[in-house]
From Swiss-Prot:
Family: Belongs to the ATG12 family.
Predominant localisation class: cytoplasm
Protein name: Ubiquitin-like protein ATG12B
Keyword Cytoplasm set for record: yes
Subcellular location: Cytoplasm
Gene Ontology biological-process entries: autophagosome assembly; autophagy; protein transport
């Protein structure tokens, strides 16, 4: 039986929540590979919203570094089986 690293096979549920005047996505929950960088989530949101101006926050608290891996963010800040990512078109929190 071949073993793979847990980061390569684990999928993380990312719950995208609109904040402020940002448009609400038709589908708010997506599965993302744990090995992906958070920058992939940001790029995906930019494509969905057709906007270059985007501010993202984890748990309405902080804006993570785009180089962070999704699995690390989930392990440290995820709850109820998902990573909550708030997004806005203008700065929502300092």
């Amino acid at each position: 039986m071949a073993t793979e690293s847990p980061n390569s096979v684990q999928k993380i549920v990312v719950h995208l929540r609109a904040t402020g005047g940002a448009p609400i996505l038709k589908q708010s929950k997506f599965k993302v590979s744990g090995s992906d960088k958070f920058a992939n989530v940001i790029d995906f949101l930019r494509r969905q919203l057709h906007s270059d101006s985007l501010f993202v926050y984890v748990n309405s608290a902080f804006s993570p570094n785009p180089d962070e891996s999704v699995i690390d963010l989930y392990n440290n800040f995820g709850f109820d089986g998902k990573l909550v990512v708030n997004y806005a078109c203008s700065m929502a929190w300092g």
